[in-house]
Amino acid sequence: MSSVTLEFRPREEQTAFNLRRWDEILSEPAWFKVDGRIETDRHGRILLRPPAAPRHGRFQAKIITLLTKLMPPGEVLPECPISTADGVRAADVVWVSQQRWRELGNRACFVQAPEICVEVISPGNSEEEIREKIDLYFDAGAQEVWTCGAFGQMTFFGPGSAPLDKSRFCADFQPKSNERSYC
C-alpha cells in the first residue's frame, strides 16, 4: 500500500482564506435556512452535517452548564467556528478565556482555537474523524480537547498526549457520584 502526503497551505494563508470564505458563507441568507451544521474543508467547499440528535444537544447543554459553573470568567459557546489547517470546523462546545475572546474581535470565526474544545461524539463519527478533529484543534491552538461519548463519558486530551485522567483546566469536572457519566 502506498502512502499519501497531503500538502497544506501555510497557516497564515489558510487562515486568511478560511476567514474570507466564512464571511462569504455568512453573507448569504440562504445558508441561515439550512438545518444542521455547516463547516468547510481546506478548499472552501461546504460540508453539511445533519441536525444533531436530541441526546447530542442534551450533552452539549450539560457541558455548557458545567463549564459555566466550574471555570473562571471566560465565554462558553456551542457550535463554535474555528479556522483550522483543514478549513473551518465547528466544535460542539468551547471555553475561551477573556483574552482570546478579545483577540477574536469582529471576526466571524476563531483564528486561534479556544483553550478548551469539546466534541460530542455522534453515532456517525468514526474514530479517525474524531482523531483528525482533535489534531486540528490542537494545531489551531487549543490547550485541551475533550470528547463526550454516547453515554456522557468524557475523555480529556492535552497536546500530543494520551488521554488525561482529568482536565488540567477544570479538575472539578468529575463524574456524578456512583456513575461513569460526567453529564
Regions found by a protein language model. Give the residues of each.
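Gly/Pro/Ser/Thr-rich low-complexity, intrinsically disordered segments predominantly at protein N-termini
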Residues: M1-C183
